Amino acid sequence: MKTKTIVFIHGMYMNSLCWEHWVNLCQTKGYRCLAPDWPGRDKPIEVLRKNHPDQQLGHLTLGRVLEHFADTIKTLDEKPIIIGHSMGGLAVQLLLQRDLAVAGVAIDSAPPMGVFTTKWSFLKSNWPHITPFVSQNSPIEMTFERFQYTFVNSFPLAEQRAAYERYVVPESRRIPRNSLTARVGFKKSHPPLLLIAGSADNIIPASLIKSNYAKYKRTSSVTDFKEFAGRTHFIIGQKNWEEVAEYILAWLNEKGV
């Protein structure tokens, strides 16, 4: 029997609102969709911004986010499909190896330990939240100018501004630092996994996703890679996002899940 439940996992600097269009589309395809917020993020965007700097946010860790989603998944009546974006993509990789899902899709996945690049756009985009010169307990705001470069670099200005105002929230510095030591068991068998990259992504370059994908070559488990031309890091909210979503749904159907 095919799974009809999808759990969406958002990434850094956003909450579950970023999945609004995906949830609607997948529901029309007959899926039950859950898009939980990270701990403490189940508030309106304007409230999350107003609360900056939120000391509770400053102490949020990747481990806590993972357990939050693991606990949610364990309450379901069937193993779900999990789809994550950015740090949510890394969460998919980590949860999949715990056998908590029937399949996973990691979109623009943040790199786990052992996957790195010296590409300038990656270093420039990630330095503000991993710099050792600022306390890890200090939450960070995403400025509009930084959002333009890291998430929506090819969007028209009006669309950049609209996306920033609708979706962007402050973030914990601990989470990206935790990802540097997040261990993915690349040799371990796992349910089907699809890694997706955007060719115009500055913060998580497509070459980095390819390196992530290549690490799985020593396992016989199904691991696939797809690069979408012209897509930025905010591929899930970019024009023609439906093309990406439909590709994923077709892939899931092909894999029998």
Predicted regions and their residues:
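Active-site glycine-rich loops that stabilize anionic/oxyanionic intermediates
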Residues: 11-14, 199
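Gly/Ala-rich beta-loop-alpha elbow adjacent to hydrolase catalytic centers
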Residues: 83-88, 92
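Short alpha-helix in the alpha/beta-hydrolase fold that links the catalytic acid
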Residues: 205-215
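Catalytic active-site module of serine/aspartate enzymes centered on a nucleophile-bearing elbow/loop
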Residues: 222-257
